[in-house]
Regions:
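Bacterial Sec-dependent N-terminal signal peptides
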Residues: 1-25
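Beta-strand/loop edge motif enriched in small/polar residues
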Residues: 21-290
Length: 290
């Protein structure tokens, strides 16, 4: 990490036992950061998109490495459909339409890249910057501490397709592994900034590891309720909060990292870690575990 000239803050959370196999570190030839991460994403050229993703995906769909995809507007995966993304696939987000990918409750994403062939979500602009597009939202049916069993995320989305929450802590929204999310966090008119990755009511069967968020104008990783296991996450030069947990989440996070820079941090409340139970007391049911 000494190669970076800017001010860095390293945030490490580790979980281990004396009988467990030792985890890879972040230095040297065995670093878990090797190959799949990218600390200069604005220098990368992924070419032009030749396929368009738009509207509502209601049947099982596969994205192929041989194509470059343009994500246009709010793209919903719904109707219990499975969106499978091959390793090495690049998805360019259309900055003009505030592109956002929403995996609705009951639907699934299988985005399982490889250490040598990660999946990349990034801006379609030639000169990329934080907040170029929305982000990725996973909605599940695991519990939260809110009143009732169902809530909806804001961000100017379709209310019917943006609900989350339920009673199934063991629910499975799919896999995000060896995935990079770059230049997300677009500002909305009424609800602040998108998060690069929002997990709302996501259950513990969902696999979430080796995910890198770079240059997000909002929060990098935000978790509403649910019961998720997070490992080997990277937040790089996020403007707001790197890791935010809210609404009674029962999350576990280990071996993860935040790299901050004072020149791209928000003066309104930028921090590495935020763990709260609610935004306002009237939102939550204090009798709930979550």
């Amino acid at each position: 990490m000494k190669n970076f000239s800017q001010f860095l803050l390293l945030f490490l959370l580790g979980v281990c036992s004396v009988n467990a196999q030792q985890e890879k570190g972040i230095k040297g030839s065995t670093s878990w950061l090797n190959n799949w991460t990218e600390f200069k994403p604005n220098k990368k050229d992924y070419g032009e998109a030749n396929q368009i993703l738009a509207g509502n995906i209601t049947e099982n769909t596969r994205l192929y490495k041989k194509n470059v995809y343009l994500l246009q507007g709010n793209v919903y995966v719904s109707n219990k459909a499975v969106l499978t993304i091959e390793p090495g696939t690049v998805i360019l987000a259309d900055t003009g339409s505030s592109a956002t990918l929403i995996i609705t409750k009951g639907a699934t994403i299988i985005a399982e890249g490889l250490e040598t062939d990660p999946i990349v979500f990034t801006s379609n602009k030639a000169m990329k910057k934080a907040g170029d597009w929305g982000g990725i939202i996973l909605l599940g049916d695991a519990p939260t501490n809110k009143f009732g069993n169902v809530s909806s995320v804001n961000f100017e989305l379709d209310n019917y397709l943006s609900t989350y929450g339920g009673n199934n802590s063991n629910s499975n929204s799919g896999i995000l592994r060896y995935v990079r999310i770059e230049f997300a966090g677009k500002k909305t008119k009424s609800f602040g900034n998108f998060n690069a990755l929002l997990l709302a009511g996501v259950g513990n069967k969902t696999i979430l590891d080796n995910i890198m968020v770079s240059y997000c104008l909002g929060n990098a990783f935000e978790i509403y309720g649910g019961e998720v296991n997070l490992s080997k996450l990277v937040s790089f030069k996020t403007n707001c909060i790197d890791y935010k947990f809210n609404y009674g989440t029962q999350s576990k996070i280990d071996n993860s990292l935040a790299i901050r820079n004072s020149y791209v941090s928000s003066s309104l409340g930028s921090k590495c870690l935020s763990v709260i139970s609610y935004d306002t007391k009237s939102q939550v049911d204090f009798s709930k575990k979550h």
